[in-house]
């Protein structure tokens, strides 16, 4: 039995809305590093039954991959209380994945929302200035 949930454009929003803590593995069948990360992700899902571990097949769900700007796979994203708090491409080793989950569990989401609001306010004030030099 798998401990992960296959996410599609049909169930993605509801899964993220209904669950406080969702990990998302963006992957594809042809991707070698994705196949290496798969068992690590499954093991983490079994070790953390209180969290939702979702998988997005970027070949079957290109709209979801595009919506999140996924350009490299595998990419791991963590969404807490509907806020993306972590996103990183690459197959994380088991110890690194465990560490990231632990750090995400410890986040003070009130502080995170405050920081996001401040960033959005700053971006609004700066307009396109932040685009220079890229």
Curated annotation (Swiss-Prot):
Is NADP set as a keyword in this record? no
Q: Which Pfam family is an annotated match for this chain, by its short name?
A: Thioredoxin
Q: What GO CC terms are in its UniProt record?
A: cytoplasm; cytosol
Primary localization: cytoplasm
Q: Which cysteines are joined by disulfide bonds?
A: 31-34
Q: CDD domains from the xrefs? A: TRX_family
Outline the segment boundaries, as ranges, of region: Disordered. Answer: 115-134
Q: Which InterPro entries does the entry link to?
A: Thioredoxin (IPR005746), Thioredoxin-like_sf (IPR036249), Thioredoxin_CS (IPR017937), Thioredoxin_domain (IPR013766)
UniProt KW keywords: Cytoplasm, Disulfide bond, Electron transport, Redox-active center, Transport
Instruction: Summarize induction of expression.
Output: Expressed from 2 promoters, 1 of which (trxCp1) is under control of SigR. Dramatically but transiently induced by the thiol-oxidizing agent diamide. In an rsrA mutant expression is constitutive and uninduced by diamide.
Where composition is biased (Low complexity), the residues are 117-134
All residue ranges annotated as the Thioredoxin domain in the record: 3-106
Under Gene Ontology molecular function, one entry of this record is: protein-disulfide reductase activity
**Places the protein is found:** Cytoplasm
Q: What does this protein do?
A: Component of the thioredoxin-thioredoxin reductase system. Participates in various redox reactions through the reversible oxidation of its active center dithiol to a disulfide and catalyzes dithiol-disulfide exchange reactions.
Could you say which protein family the record assigns here? Belongs to the thioredoxin family.
Cited PANTHER family = GEO12009P1 (PTHR45663), THIOREDOXIN 2 (PTHR45663:SF40)
Q: Please report the name of this protein according to its UniProt entry.
A: Putative thioredoxin 2
Organism of this sequence: Streptomyces coelicolor (strain ATCC BAA-471 / A3(2) / M145)
Gene name, per UniProt, is: trxC
């Amino acid at each position: 039995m798998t401990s992960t949930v296959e996410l599609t454009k049909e169930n993605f929003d509801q899964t993220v809305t209904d669950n406080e803590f969702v990990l998302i593995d963006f992957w594809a069948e042809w991707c070698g590093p994705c196949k290496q990360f798969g068992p690590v992700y499954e093991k983490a899902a079994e070790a953390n039954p209180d969290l939702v571990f979702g998988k997005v097949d970027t070949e079957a769900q290109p709209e979801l991959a595009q919506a999140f700007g996924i350009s490299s796979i595998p990419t791991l994203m963590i969404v807490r209380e509907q806020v993306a708090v972590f996103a990183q491409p690459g197959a994380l080793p088991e110890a690194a994945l465990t560490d990231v989950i632990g750090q995400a569990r410890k986040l003070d989401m009130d502080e995170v929302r405050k920081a996001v609001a401040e960033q959005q306010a700053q971006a609004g004030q700066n307009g396109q200035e932040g685009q220079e030099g890229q």
